């Protein structure tokens, strides 16, 4: 998989994001569940999550926010069950072939996906139970 993270970083360095271009996350109503990994090779997910958290800390909002950033998890920070549903055969092999961090840190990436599965299930069940 081609790493595009540098492309995103270079693009933002050449044209810093203006206020008008920011996504107004403070206007989101409901639960905002942000998940990313430091070793995302496609874009700097952790930076963007931190940026959204900072914006929410500075702006009035009514959304409930849960943000989780894993050291290892690659760009595929899917819940483990979802990944196995999408790729019932060979999901672990695919992730290892697509992302070098998954090959280097397979246990950590798997642990992150299992934790994401647990957290997302809890968020969805909490939402369902409030209805």
Protein language model regions, located:
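Short beta-strand/loop motif that positions the catalytic acidic residue
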Residues: 28, 33-40
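Acidic catalytic loop of the alpha/beta-hydrolase fold
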Residues: 38-43, 74-77
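C-terminal catalytic histidine-bearing segment of alpha/beta-hydrolase fold enzymes
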Residues: 50, 61-131
């Amino acid at each position: 998989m081609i790493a595009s993270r540098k492309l995103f970083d270079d693009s933002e360095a050449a044209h810093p994001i203006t206020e008008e271009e920011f996504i107004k996350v403070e206007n989101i109503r409901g639960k905002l569940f942000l998940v990313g990994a430091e070793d995302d090779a496609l874009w700097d997910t952790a930076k963007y999550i931190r940026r959204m958290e900072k914006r929410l800390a500075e702006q009035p909002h009514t959304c409930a926010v849960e943000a989780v950033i894993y050291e290892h998890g690659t760009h595929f920070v899917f819940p483990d069950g979802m990944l196995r549903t999408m790729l019932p055969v060979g999901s672990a092999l695919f992730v290892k072939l697509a992302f070098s961090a998954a090959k280097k840190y397979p246990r950590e990436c798997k642990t992150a996906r299992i934790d994401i599965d647990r957290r997302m299930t809890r968020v969805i069940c909490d939402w369902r139970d409030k209805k």
